[in-house]
Amino acid sequence: MRLLLLAGLFLSVTALAQTPTPTPTPTPEEQYFEQPPEKPHLEFLWDALARYDSIYHLRVRPDIERGRFEVRPELDFVVSDRFKVGVRAVGDLGTDQNVNNGPNFDNYRSRGATVERYFVEGRPGQFVIDAGAFGMPLLASEMLWDHDIQTPGAAVSWEIPAGASTVTVTGAGFYGPQRQGDQTRIGAGQVVWRHGDPDRFQTEIAGSYWHFEPDDLKNTYFRQNYFTVDSQGQRHFISDFHEADLLLRLRFPIGHVPVLLSFDALKNYGTRGIAKDDADAFEGNVTIGRVGNPWDWRFFYTFQYVERDALMGAYNTDDWWFHTWYKGSRVGIALTVLPRLFVQGSVMFQKRLDLPTTLNRVMIDLVKMF
């Protein structure tokens, strides 16, 4: 063995002697160079939705069959990777009228166009600072917040490395997110812990507190929540809305297929009077697959149980029919037909907690993604 080692050493030395001296390999410090700063530029993005929507078994109303067409163009001025300014418009054309949106519990207007998003975003260091009207900066399920509703106000997030994990702390204040002159004030805080790689196994836990102060909210947005009516015909909530939310998400692949499991539990600590025992809500979701590239597919199943005053029904998803006071399931499957363009079909089964009848909603969507 010793002779073999000596022979190998001798051959190595001989080879080195016959080989021109190579250029020394730079150390990691010498290899490093800073990428040139990003030049200011404009970015144009847009998405669109074409939807067939059918709701039936409504008991006291005729069945509804309608179409919805929406486009959202966005223009961002990107100053650098740490600062940008943006504006986004939304245009809708539906087969129903705007007067139908209230009775149909919609968060959108069937016909019209408006500027819905205008924001300034800065990213100094580990912080993200948003001001204006922007997308929801906190992690929230559709049971709690409809992500098509923009959030006028300000938000600050701080990402803190913690070994193999990260902790993100967010504080935000919003003013009047709903349409028709809403002046509701909302304060929210959240802590998110993330660990792992979603391509292997990732855990995400988010705890948040939401404080709502309703003001000048139109009667149509009281929906299924408990309320009283004053002598002028204006509605007033019976409960306050001080909501604590705990969201758990698990991401992992099965083969090459991504899987998301999500569980959301919420409790309103502001219920009172006849609403005292109607304070809890839960959502469970499984999503398998993805969309975006041709022939990508995605399957999802969602279960929701929401008591009457567990949350404010003015701001959560309108893809279901009732906004609170129900339990139900929604299942759907999507297929990408062109880059960033997919078709999705879904069916929803929903029952109000005080009624035996289950209503159904079928939606077929053609979606162009940002």
Residue positions per predicted region:
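Short strand-loop junctions, especially beta-strand C-caps/beta-turns
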Residues: 49, 134, 172-176, 266-268, ...
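Detector for outer-membrane/organellar transmembrane beta-barrel domains
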Residues: 198-328
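Bacterial N-terminal signal peptides
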Residues: 4-14
